[in-house]
Amino acid sequence: MSYSFTEKKRIRKSFAKRENVLEVPFLLATQIDSYAKFLQLENAFDKRTDDGLQAAFNSIFPIVSHNGYARLEFVHYTLGEPLFDIPECQLRGITYAAPLRARIRLVILDKEASKPTVKEVRENEVYMGEIPLMTPSGSFVINGTERVIVSQLHRSPGVFFEHDKGKTHSSGKLLFSARIIPYRGSWLDFEFDPKDLLYFRIDRRRKMPVTILLKALGYNNEQILDIFYDKETFYLSSNGVQTDLVAGRLKGETAKVDILDKEGNVLVAKGKRITAKNIRDITNAGLTRLDVEPESLLGKALAADLIDSETGEVLASANDEITEELLAKFDINGVKEITTLYINELDQGAYISNTLRTDETAGRQAARVAIYRMMRPGEPPTEEAVEQLFNRLFFSEDSYDLSRVGRMKFNTRTYEQKLSEAQQNSWYGRLLNETFAGAADKGGYVLSVEDIVASIATLVELRNGHGEVDDIDHLGNRRVRSVGELTENQFRSGLARVERAVKERLNQAESENLMPHDLINAKPVSAAIKEFFGSSQLSQFMDQTNPLSEVTHKRRVSALGPGGLTRERAGFEVRDVHPTHYGRVCPIETPEGPNIGLINSLSVYARTNDYGFLETPYRRVIDGKVTEEIDYLSAIEEGRYVIAQANADLDSDGNLIGDLVTCREKGETIMATPDRVQYMDVATGQVVSVAASLIPFLEHDDANRALMGANMQRQAVPCLRPEKPMVGTGIERSVAVDSATAIVARRGGVVEYVDANRVVIRVHDDEATAGEVGVDIYNLVKFTRSNQSTNINQRPAVKAGDVLQRGDLVADGASTDLGELALGQNMTIAFMPWNGYNYEDSILISEKVAADDRYTSIHIEELNVVARDTKLGAEDITRDIPNLSERMQNRLDESGIVYIGAEVEAGDVLVGKVTPKGETQLTPEEKLLRAIFGEKASDVKDTSLRMPTGMSGTVIDVQVFTREGIQRDKRAQSIIDSELKRYRLDLNDQLRIFDNDAFDRIERMIVGQKANGGPMKLAKGSEITTEYLAGLPSRHDWFDIRLTDEDLAKQLELIKVSLQQKREEADELYEIKKKKLTQGDELQPGVQKMVKVFIAIKRRLQAGDKMAGRHGNKGVVSRILPVEDMPYMADGRPVDIVLNPLGVPSRMNIGQILEVHLGWAAKGIGERIDRMLKEQRKAGELREFLNRLYNGSGKKEDLDSLTDEEIIELASNLRKGASFASPVFDGAKESEIREMLNLAYPSEDPEVEKLGFNDSKTQITLYDGRSGEAFDRKVTVGVMHYLKLHHLVDEKMHARSTGPYSLVTQQPLGGKAQFGGQRFGEMEVWALEAYGAAYTLQEMLTVKSDDVNGRTKMYENIVKGEHKIDAGMPESFNVLVKEIRSLGLDIDLERY
């Protein structure tokens, strides 16, 4: 096994028992692939598939004019280059987007020609607005902020059958219904009512009998009955009534008469129930007809019109009920044979027949008019309008789209379903197999008559007791709409608006000689796109607290949003975990609160298929042997197979062991024999999402706490010095790399140069393309503000000279340590109560932790100020501010902007700004002063940007934006100059590195080669030496050497051209950058100048901050205790954190205890390694110890492949503690933890004996830091990875003396953002009442709240030194009086 450059630095010891069959896939693939499919930039114009933008254009174009003589055709589209790159867009507050241009062809037909003849074709490119581009990490930059488009889980188009579970009617009767849901267009519902009549609705409007719809589709009564019923024929004669014998129909019936065979023997006596044996006897007897009683005909319905063959008179119509009068009429007219509908109570109901009787419409036209009146009440139904509406509802491609998915779902549910033998022989089987044979193949993306009839038939068959209803929460009935599809829908809706406008103008296209770009206005398209990305419910401000929160946000799947559910209407079933979620959607990670179950996270291995359904991978099992073959199955496909769990036992050849294996089949857990198993899970962590799979020992935690643990990891604030978790799960590296926080090498090579801002790698010759100068430059992100104001900062993780392979770590980012996710710090933890400071989950923490900056985090705040053009004149950014103290002015430069590096506190001026004041009436004294001293500075008011309350920090960056045409101030100019200077240095460095690399390659290539001549009179045929090359005046003279080897000569020429291109490219880039910086900035209307000040705030850990482990064990820091008072071990080491042991049993998150034990072992092993290194032991001893660590149990590591230097580097990286991986559901067992504890703390070690371990090495003796005495009982001590969460007390603490008031009630506002007061509510009033504190209460309810006059009076009294209160009438009382008056009740106050 070979390790990469990064892996061998710190190998994580894994306890996994099963080898990894499938690598963790790229975690952002869903987003990136979806948008790539939408744009199709990689495909040539003619190779683009009908997806995304292409599909949207194809669905709207061609646009044909109303008269039909002009049409616009779509040829292809192109996307330009974005004007600004991503960081520039973020800085300027603009959208990272590219211009979209479509080539459109205008075709004008000849009006005079007898047949369609093209008269003229005009073609040009039309600008269609800007399309936001996705960043490489799967987000979008919209108006300067990073946003994520969350995927939506919605109901798949198709047909669904369900019942109301007996909730609608008091009797508890099941009412069946069906619904055809298109991707776009009207919904069609069919439903039974409690009387078993069948109705339909369009778009949830008024219900109408379903037979109206069938008549509107062109069926008459007789045809309707013919479709939905089997027939019975009765033969009438003077001897009685006979019917054709259909054996299958007799089962379970009671014989109305004696059934006799041909000899007259009784086969079934009258009144007896007919059994299966009786039916066999009847069939064997060869009977073809049965006698029936004439009375049994009564109540049956006729299947067809009965017409007298002689007179042509209609004796009875189809669906008429047979009565005695009708039978008598038949007798008189000599009717010998009648056909009725075969109806029984058990499995052939009279639903359609009864519905037809309630339907009064006569024929197709009347039925369509009835539908028109229901859809457009009050509008007169003209024949044309009626036809148009009916056809547009379900049969027009413009207004109805079932989509590819919808058609597939529809066909599988209706035409392609498996029928039982009884169904095959019934009307339903005939309908699907004969009448509608081939309907599934010709079905387009609109509904056909057959589709509607097949849906009704399936619903009737369900009511008859055949078939199953659908489960709408099954993931086979819910599909994912990702970014690409959501954007495509918005784009299409914008294009549809364009189409309406274009149609109006197309008629004038020829007469006015218009071109395509004159006809098309792209505003509606760009408005639709802008609205979607800017304010859609699914376009969300990206959660960027740490790399995990970024990844999880992009993998989120929401059931909310347009076309989805709403929180209020979503019931329990939709939110619940469903068996089909297995391996597709995480059962653990979902928010607490109103969104629980509606917002989910994709499982680690889940992906979407072409139809949008979620799939999960499985290993194929053949004859009990597990193969390496992997298939992705959707929820529908999975239902057909028997699937074993990932932890099923296998022998060395991969065969399933044991008589029975735990499996899943159709959502149920079963025990199956190995030969029945068809698939097996790929990994134990397949079920859960990324965040949940980061929790070690997840299998030992209660699900509710695991949910909290998964959610709280996303809120962890990046620490100043990230520290990898000692106990991880092995997926940390994937998260760090895929989130793009840590930088990995694009190509292998040698590290040429490293500083804090840049890493330069010279690419290996075999990975560089021919003639290309192979240098990769990685510019690192330094101290940048994230969306949540946390700090994004990348640190190089390599040294000059390191040899890297593709995918190796180049630089660490926020919350990553050696390319692994590191959200918190490893803390030594003791579980014990300590003076009540850990009551109710509080956390007692050592002062040493705060002093060592273990949990110190940097937060970057961005403060903006804009200078606008006001009616009274322009605002000015200046240093000249009235009444500003000298101390504050010293921080500002001559332009009035704070210096970088200045330490600022609340209230300090950051940017000086003055606003013109309106002309005020001057007093005579002021006039006199004006006359004496001339114009003064009093006609401006100070509107400077000041540091907000409760905030202090260091200014780390200032950006100044100036509108085009306005003089830049010195500060703005100096920022531009320094930026250009830095950029030029960057380019020069790059060119230098390119040059050096190129000439190194040339030297390796030509030294030792023969030359035909060259500079400094190089003789023909002489060999080129290093000395000769060194002696040339310039390295560029090397290109003048004429080589004998033509291939090498060509390569030399290529490198020369390549270098020249690089130089030209660098000059071009510099000019572009210069132009970007020196041209005016696009600012909002009326804004002349904008200044952004970035302030870095250091937040140390303090009491009130929220902290948590990874198991949902959260708490608030109650006290930071001096290190000398903390409980300490026998060797004098104090613990870092003291937690309450009572927080574990009731919460049932035992995983934290196992983590603590394994962490304790990791720390002990680290200490032993540290001791060995300090004692300078031989590499062989280290290798032997590491072998015991890595190859004792679990996954084996190949340490023999490492050199002694690599072993020493690995050991020194483990000094602080070994790295363990305990994968989810395949983690370390108790015995393995004991094994590690014994390795860390061997009993023969005297140091170990001193600590006072218990037998299992999990508890030690601790001493009280205050008294020095040992605690009575041994205490569980260990190491846990503990996180500091984003809920910091600094951001929540807030105090107010006076501040803003509400206009109506005159009471203080509430909340920190409004600088509000504390509400003294009803319960607090009771408390004061209980104590009888009358004066305090009076103050609270009047002067301190909303008694304006009393407040003013009290202030005056205090100023005068009179400490008394004159309380008046609270304003809220006046509001109450007004409220009562508004209800028409007069109320007056009588003052005494």
UniProtKB/Swiss-Prot annotation:
EC numbers for this chain: 2.7.7.6
First-level EC class: transferase
A single BP term in Gene Ontology: DNA-templated transcription
Coiled coil: none
InterPro entries, A to Z: DNA-dir_RNA_pol_bsu_ext_1_sf (IPR042107), DNA-dir_RNA_pol_bsu_external_1 (IPR019462), DNA-dir_RNA_pol_su2 (IPR015712), DNA-dir_RNAP_su2_dom (IPR007120), DNA-dir_RNAP_su2_hyb_sf (IPR037033), RNA_pol_bsu_bac (IPR010243), RNA_pol_bsu_CS (IPR007121), RNA_pol_bsu_protrusion (IPR007644)
Gene3D superfamilies: 2.40.50.100, 2.40.50.150, 3.90.1100.10, DNA-directed RNA polymerase, beta subunit, external 1 domain, DNA-directed RNA polymerase, subunit 2, domain 6, RNA polymerase alpha subunit dimerisation domain, RNA polymerase Rpb2, domain 2
Molecular-function annotations in GO: DNA binding; DNA-directed RNA polymerase activity; ribonucleoside binding
GO cellular component, one term: DNA-directed RNA polymerase complex
Catalytic activity entry: RNA(n) + a ribonucleoside 5'-triphosphate = RNA(n+1) + diphosphate
Keyword Transcription applies: yes
Pfam families: RNA_pol_Rpb2_1, RNA_pol_Rpb2_2, RNA_pol_Rpb2_3, RNA_pol_Rpb2_45, RNA_pol_Rpb2_6, RNA_pol_Rpb2_7
Keywords: DNA-directed RNA polymerase, Nucleotidyltransferase, Transcription, Transferase
Record text on subunit structure and interactions: The RNAP catalytic core consists of 2 alpha, 1 beta, 1 beta' and 1 omega subunit. When a sigma factor is associated with the core the holoenzyme is formed, which can initiate transcription.
NCBIfam families attached to this UniProt entry: PRK00405.1 (NF001616), rpoB (TIGR02013)
Protein family membership: Belongs to the RNA polymerase beta chain family.
Function: DNA-dependent RNA polymerase catalyzes the transcription of DNA into RNA using the four ribonucleoside triphosphates as substrates.
Record-given protein name: DNA-directed RNA polymerase subunit beta
